[in-house]
């Protein structure tokens, strides 16, 4: 039987429940358990796919094409399990499923209510997501006390009755503030947060105290007494300069031994040596580079979470401190791209909408003309192709139909047919719904032998994850290739969509339609980002030598 660990958060949001949950998972995995993770989101949206990055942050795409919470990215980076659609569900999905069953007559004329029907559906979906794992760690989104979270909290309360104490464990992450003017740590917010949980019927087994300083023993005893938790189960979760230090931090305080004892697990000792090597590379870099990330969501860097982590992973594997300089593309649109001259490399990430596009085009042109390593991802590839069409291939005014429906050269256009992750043909047009209608998930790509892409990946067949609605217009490919653009990768399906482009006369110029950042991990990195960081290092060395 799968054992469940439920992680809740209290006092304030954005405490790092996802990191804490993923760190616990990493420790348990290192002790030989098969671990999976679930995120339960209390918002009514079916998924975050149509939500603004400024509200929700990054949308993480799974291999099977689910648009999910960014915490699933943390899960994949901390443990070896690959997330699926069943690892993330929302209030919207739960209600949609229950209403569908009611319309179908599944409830035999009964009155459909939050309890038991909604809570039963939540438990059913948790069971599906947990599958055949030894342990499933379930993170409940939101903050204890929010009305939206109540059905989820009731469902996890019932799980102890359904599965027993030896198969369920509750972890509560709470904020313990330090009041500088008083010079005191305040435990009252945590006491009240636990009181809220206990009123619902949940008694935390472990308390994680989110703090900016170490938790004194007397305060630990106080929290244990008033929250009815064993003193050794009151664990500090402190600010850290790297999220990859958290597994070691929690393990040092014995969290995995507490879990093993309550869940009656006989486990080998934890082996966190891989995490020790990661931390060593982070703390002792041999090099340092500056990469300009030119985007439109730079005021909320969570929008590019997987991408920034992928660059850090590449830094780990090249022992390089990667300093990411976030550049607002609207500033470049207004002031020009000269500010990018001192950068060791330039990157244009994915995005949607017209705002800031011309600034990104200027950034690509600057990288191309000044032989600065360039990496374009998703929209960043489309932007590179538009710039090349305009400034090299002689297609004045070339654009994407996303930004200009009346352009004379629609070199990027709405994709209307493709083969999805399951091998089925998908069709879309301008009248299709916005939600869940993009080209999503892992897709096979064939690379040209001898190309930069093939050399980087060490293969001519790869699979990468996608999330886009627009594609390179194949009608203009021949003209672009005649002007010197290299199409080095295409989709494996009959539609042969453009997946990667290169400039062979450039130091290092590569752009891809897919999102390689979604499969990068601190343990293994990703070959594309590692190659990109190496190119930036080479460019830096040449600048210093000249």
Curated annotation (Swiss-Prot):
Residues engaged in binding UTP: 13, 186-191, 222
List of catalytic residues: 378 (nucleophile), 515, 517
Residues that bind Mg(2+): 71, 139
GO terms of molecular function: ATP binding; CTP synthase activity; glutaminase activity; identical protein binding; metal ion binding
Annotated Gene Ontology cellular component terms: cytosol
InterPro entries: Class_I_gatase-like, CTP_synthase, CTP_synthase_N, GATASE, GATase1_CTP_Synthase, P-loop_NTPase
Binding sites annotated in the UniProt record for L-glutamine: 351, 379-382, 402, 469
Description of how activity is regulated: Allosterically activated by GTP, when glutamine is the substrate; GTP has no effect on the reaction when ammonia is the substrate. The allosteric effector GTP functions by stabilizing the protein conformation that binds the tetrahedral intermediate(s) formed during glutamine hydrolysis. Inhibited by the product CTP, via allosteric rather than competitive inhibition.
Source domain of life: Bacteria
Note: CTPSs have evolved a hybrid strategy for distinguishing between UTP and CTP. The overlapping regions of the product feedback inhibitory and substrate sites recognize a common feature in both compounds, the triphosphate moiety. To differentiate isosteric substrate and product pyrimidine rings, an additional pocket far from the expected kinase/ligase catalytic site, specifically recognizes the cytosine and ribose portions of the product inhibitor.
Protein name (record): CTP synthase
Species per Swiss-Prot/TrEMBL record: Chromobacterium violaceum (strain ATCC 12472 / DSM 30191 / JCM 1249 / CCUG 213 / NBRC 12614 / NCIMB 9131 / NCTC 9757 / MK)
């Amino acid at each position: 039987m799968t054992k469940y660990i439920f992680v809740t958060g209290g006092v304030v949001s954005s405490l790092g429940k996802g990191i804490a949950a993923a760190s616990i998972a990493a420790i348990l995995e290192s002790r030989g358990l098969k671990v999976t993770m679930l995120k339960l989101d209390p918002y009514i949206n079916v998924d975050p796919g149509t939500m603004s990055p400024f509200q929700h942050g990054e949308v993480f795409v799974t291999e099977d094409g689910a648009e999910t919470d960014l915490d699933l990215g943390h899960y994949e980076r901390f443990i070896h399990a690959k997330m699926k659609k069943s690892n993330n569900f929302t209030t919207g999905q739960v209600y949609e499923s229950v209403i569908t069953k009611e319309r179908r007559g599944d409830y035999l004329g009964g009155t459909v209510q939050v309890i038991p029907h909604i809570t039963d559906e939540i438990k059913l979906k948790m069971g599906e997501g947990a599958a055949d794992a030894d342990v499933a760690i379930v993170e409940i989104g939101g903050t204890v006390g929010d009305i939206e979270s109540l059905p989820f909290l009731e469902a996890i309360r019932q799980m102890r009755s359904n599965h027993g104490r030896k198969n369920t464990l509750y972890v509560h992450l709470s904020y313990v503030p330090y009041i500088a003017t008083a010079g005191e740590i305040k435990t009252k917010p945590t006491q009240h947060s636990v009181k809220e949980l206990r009123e619902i019927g949940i008694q935390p087994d472990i308390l994680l105290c989110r703090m900016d300083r170490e938790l004194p023993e007397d305060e630990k005893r106080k929290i244990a007494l008033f929250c009815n938790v064993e003193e050794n189960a009151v664990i500090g979760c402190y600010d850290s300069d790297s999220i990859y230090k958290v597994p070691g931090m929690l393990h040092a305080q014995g969290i995995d031994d507490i879990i093993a004892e309550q869940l009656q697990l006989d486990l080998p000792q934890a082996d966190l040596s891989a995490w020790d090597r990661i931390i060593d590379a982070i703390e002792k870099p041999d090099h340092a580079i500056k990469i300009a990330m030119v985007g439109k969501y730079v005021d909320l860097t969570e929008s590019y979470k997987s991408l920034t982590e992928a660059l850090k992973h590449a830094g780990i594997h090249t022992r390089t401190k990667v300093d990411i300089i976030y550049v607002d593309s609207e500033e470049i649109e207004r002031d020009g791209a000269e500010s990018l001259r001192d950068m060791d490399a330039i990157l244009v990430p994915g995005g949607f909408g017209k705002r800031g596009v011309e600034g990104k085009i200027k950034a690509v042109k600057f990288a191309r003309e000044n032989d600065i390593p360039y990496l374009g991802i998703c929209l960043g590839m489309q932007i590179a192709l538009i710039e090349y069409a305009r400034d090299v291939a002689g297609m004045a005014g070339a654009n994407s139909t996303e930004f200009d429906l009346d352009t004379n050269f629609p070199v990027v256009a709405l994709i209307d047919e493709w083969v999805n992750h399951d091998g089925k043909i998908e069709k879309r047009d301008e009248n299709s719904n916005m939600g869940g209608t993009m080209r999503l998930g892992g897709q096979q790509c064939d690379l040209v032998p001898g190309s930069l892409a093939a050399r980087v990946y060490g293969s001519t067949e790869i699979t990468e994850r996608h999330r886009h609605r627009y594609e390179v217009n194949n009608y203009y490919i021949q003209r672009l290739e005649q002007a010197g653009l290299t199409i080095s990768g295409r989709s494996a399906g009959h539609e042969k969509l453009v997946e990667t482009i290169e400039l062979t006369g450039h130091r290092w110029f590569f752009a891809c339609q897919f999102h390689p950042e979604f499969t990068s991990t601190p343990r293994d990195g990703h070959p594309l980002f590692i190659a990109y960081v190496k190119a930036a290092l080479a460019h830096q060395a040449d600048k210093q030598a000249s």
